[in-house]
């Protein structure tokens, strides 16, 4: 997934957006460091999709209620043989990030890191040096 042997030229961190409370969502402001690297609309669509997926994960519904009841009735041993709704959505997020890296970010010399690896505090985007720029040195 990472561009082969390209040195890291920097990292960009997309911070959490607490304007709507403590739910997990990230700022969609386009970082200047990504200018001429990736389309602004594509970046915003990626962040919007991630925000929607995290909202889906945190949504309380019948399934979450049932999981909680089953957990109490089984002294939480139910989770040894079944995934929670939250875990299922986290897997969906990891798959989405992997697809975005393969199709959009890696070809541009970028790498999205799953926010779960950073404690859901930031979306980390690693910027790799352009081969054209680094070969001229």
UniProtKB/Swiss-Prot annotation:
Keywords: Golgi apparatus, Lipoprotein, Membrane, Palmitate. A lipid is attached at residues 69, 72 (S-palmitoyl cysteine). The keyword Membrane applies. One of its GO terms (biological process) is peptidyl-L-cysteine S-palmitoylation. Coiled coil: none annotated. It is found in: Golgi apparatus membrane. It is a lipid-anchor. One of its GO terms (cellular component) is Golgi membrane. The keyword Lipoprotein applies. May be involved in protein transport from Golgi to cell surface. The ZDHHC9-GOLGA7 complex is a palmitoyltransferase specific for HRAS and NRAS. Interacts with ZDHHC9. Belongs to the ERF4 family. This is Golgin subfamily A member 7. The gene is GOLGA7.
């Amino acid at each position: 997934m990472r561009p082969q042997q390209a040195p890291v030229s920097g990292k960009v961190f997309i911070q959490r957006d607490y304007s709507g409370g403590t739910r997990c969502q990230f700022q969609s402001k386009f970082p200047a460091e990504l200018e001429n690297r990736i389309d602004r609309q594509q970046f915003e669509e990626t962040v919007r999709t991630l925000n929607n997926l995290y909202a889906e994960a945190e949504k309380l519904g019948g399934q979450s209620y049932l999981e909680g009841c089953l957990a109490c009735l089984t002294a939480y041993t139910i989770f040894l043989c079944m995934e929670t709704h939250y875990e299922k959505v986290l897997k969906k997020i990891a798959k989405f990030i992997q697809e975005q890296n393969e199709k959009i970010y890696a070809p541009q010399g970028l790498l999205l890191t799953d926010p779960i690896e950073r404690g859901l505090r930031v979306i980390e985007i690693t910027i790799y040096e352009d081969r054209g720029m680094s070969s001229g040195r």
